[in-house]
Design a protein with these regions (language model features):
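Catalytic active-site module of serine/aspartate enzymes centered on a nucleophile-bearing elbow/loop
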Residues: 347, 352-386
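Conserved alpha/beta-hydrolase
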Residues: 70-100, 108, 112-119
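Conserved alpha/beta-hydrolase "acid-adjacent" motif
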Residues: 325-331
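Short beta-strand/loop motif that positions the catalytic acidic residue
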Residues: 312, 318-320
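N-terminal cap/lid segment of alpha/beta-hydrolase-fold proteins
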Residues: 2-42
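Accessory cap/linker subdomain of secreted extracellular hydrolases
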Residues: 101-125, 129-132, 136, 186-308
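Alpha/beta-hydrolase fold nucleophile elbow
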Residues: 152-163
Length: 386
C-alpha cells in the first residue's frame, strides 16, 4: 500500500509558500499555500484544488479510514508534486483547521470534539458571508493570484474541482476571463442543484431498491438481503431501515414512499425559502456553516450547471464514480450524451465500483490508488502536451 507523507512532512520535502489574500467582497482573508516540486527556478505548471461542500481546510479531510490518505488534497498534492507540477490548496473562508488537529485530542474534548472544533477553528461570522457568489469569487481571487506568480507557467494551469467545487469552477469560468489549460472535474454536477437535492431527498432510495435484482414486481425480504451489499444503499443507511414488514415491497409501496418524500421535500423547501438570504445557515454560532443564500440555491436553482461551460475555452475532463451516493452518476452521464454535441471540449470517464470521492466508499475518501494515478497521469499529459 502506498504511504503518504504527513501534512508537515510534505512541506519539508516540497518547498511551501503560504499566502493570505483579501477576498473580493472584503469579508474574509483567503489563506492557503503553494508547494513547488523543488526550490523554484524557472516556471512550473500548476494545479489548483477546489473542494466540495462543507467547511474544509487546505488538506481536505474527507476520508473515513483513519489514515493520512483521508486528507484527499494533501495526498493528491503529493502525487502531483512528484509528477513535477506545483499545487495550490486553500482553506475555505472562515476555516482555520480540521477535525484531526491534535489540539482536539485533549481528554476534555472527548465527548464534544465536534463542538470544540467549531469553536476553535471556525469563524462563524465569516462563514455567514458564504454565498453562491462568494464561492466563485474566492476561486477567481486565488486563480488570479496564482497566474501572476513569477514561478508559475500561466499558460499551463489546471483547475481541479470535486463535487460542489466543480460547480464553483464552472460559474467562475462563465463570469471571468480564465485561461486554464484544462478543467478536471471529479463528480461534477451537469444537471441542476435542485435536481441533485431532489434526487438525494426523494428519488434515490427507491431507485436503488428497484435496481436490486428481483423477479416480477415484488422485491422480497430475501431479494433485499441478497442484493443490499452490492447496492449503493449500503453506504447510506442500515438494511434495518428498509425492511418490508409484510415480506416484500411492491409498486404501490414505492409510489407511497415517493409521495411521502415529495411532500416532505416541499414542506422543507417552503421553510428554507422563507428565510432571509443573509441569515446564518443552519443556525447561529457556533453552528453556522454559510448564509441561507447558499442553502436556498439547492431548493430553487434549476439551471443546468453544465451550461456554465458552454463558452469555456479550456479542455474539460470529467470523472464519475458509478457507486456515487450523492449524484445519480448514470443519469448525469446519460443526460450528457444528449447534449454533448454542444460541448465538444468536454470528455467524461465513468469509473466502476468507486463513489463520490473516487474511493471505495459511496461518499467519502480515501481515493483509490488507481483513480489518483489516473488523475495525475492525465494532468501530467495535459501540461506536457504541446
Amino acid at each position: 500500500v502506498k504511504t503518504y507523507l504527513e501534512n508537515d512532512e510534505l512541506n519539508e520535502k516540497y518547498p511551501v509558500y503560504p499566502f493570505a489574500l483579501r477576498s473580493q467582497d472584503g469579508n474574509a482573508t483567503l489563506t492557503g499555500q503553494i508547494n513547488y516540486p523543488e526550490t523554484p527556478a524557472g516556471v512550473y505548471p500548476l494545479v489548483m484544488l477546489a473542494p466540495g461542500s462543507g467547511m474544509h481546510d487546505r488538506h481536505y479531510l474527507i476520508g473515513d479510514s483513519g489514515t493520512q490518505a483521508d486528507f484527499v488534497f494533501s495526498c493528491l498534492a503529493q502525487d502531483f508534486l512528484a509528477a513535477g507540477l506545483a499545487v495550490l490548496r486553500f482553506d475555505c473562508r472562515g476555516v482555520k483547521g480540521n477535525l484531526r488537529d491534535n489540539t482536539l485530542d485533549s481528554p476534555e474534548y472527548l465527548f464534544n470534539r465536534e463542538l470544540a472544533y467549531r469553536q476553535m477553528f471556525i469563524d462563524a461570522a465569516v462563514r455567514q458571508t458564504v454565498t453562491p457568489q462568494s464561492q466563485y469569487e474566492d476561486l477567481y481571487t486565488l486563480y488570479r493570484y496564482a497566474s501572476e506568480l513569477p514561478h508559475i507557467d500561466r499558460h499551463n494551469l489546471i483547475l481541479l474541482g470535486h463535487s460542489e467545487g466543480t460547480i464553483n469552477i464552472g460559474r467562475m469560468v462563465a463570469r471571468y476571463p480564465v485561461a486554464a489549460k484544462a478543467l478536471m472535474l471529479v463528480s461534477p454536477v451537469f444537471s441542476s442543484m435542485k435536481h441533485v437535492l431532489e434526487w438525494q431527498l426523494i428519488h434515490r432510495t427507491i431507485a436503488w431498491l428497484k435496481a436490486i435484482p428481483h423477479t416480477g414486481d415484488r422485491l422480497t425480504l430475501e431479494d433485499l438481503k441478497n442484493g443490499f451489499g452490492r447496492s449503493p444503499l449500503a453506504f447510506l443507511q442500515p438494511i434495518s431501515s428498509l425492511l418490508p414488514y409484510k415480506g416484500y415491497w411492491d409498486e404501490a409501496d414505492f409510489d407511497s414512499m415517493t409521495a411521502r418524500l415529495q411532500a416532505s421535500f416541499d414542506t422543507q423547501r417552503d421553510m428554507v425559502l422563507s428565510h432571509d438570504d443573509r441569515e446564518p445557515w443552519p443556525a447561529d454560532a457556533p453552528f453556522t456553516q454559510s448564509s441561507y443564500a447558499w442553502w436556498k440555491q439547492w431548493y430553487q436553482n434549476d439551471q443546468p450547471e453544465i451550461e456554465h461551460l458552454a463558452r469555456c475555452q479550456s479542455r474539460v475532463v470529467c470523472y464519475f464514480g458509478m457507486m456515487d451516493t450523492q449524484l445519480n452518476a448514470a443519469a448525469e452521464a446519460a443526460w450528457f450524451e444528449g447534449v454533448k454535441h454542444r460541448f465538444p471540449h468536454i470528455d467524461i470517464t465513468l469509473l466502476p465500483d468507486v463513489g463520490h470521492t473516487l474511493g471505495l466508499h459511496g461518499l467519502l475518501g480515501p481515493m483509490t490508488e488507481s483513480c489518483a494515478e489516473l488523475l495525475v497521469r492525465t494532468a501530467h499529459d495535459i501540461v506536457t502536451a504541446r
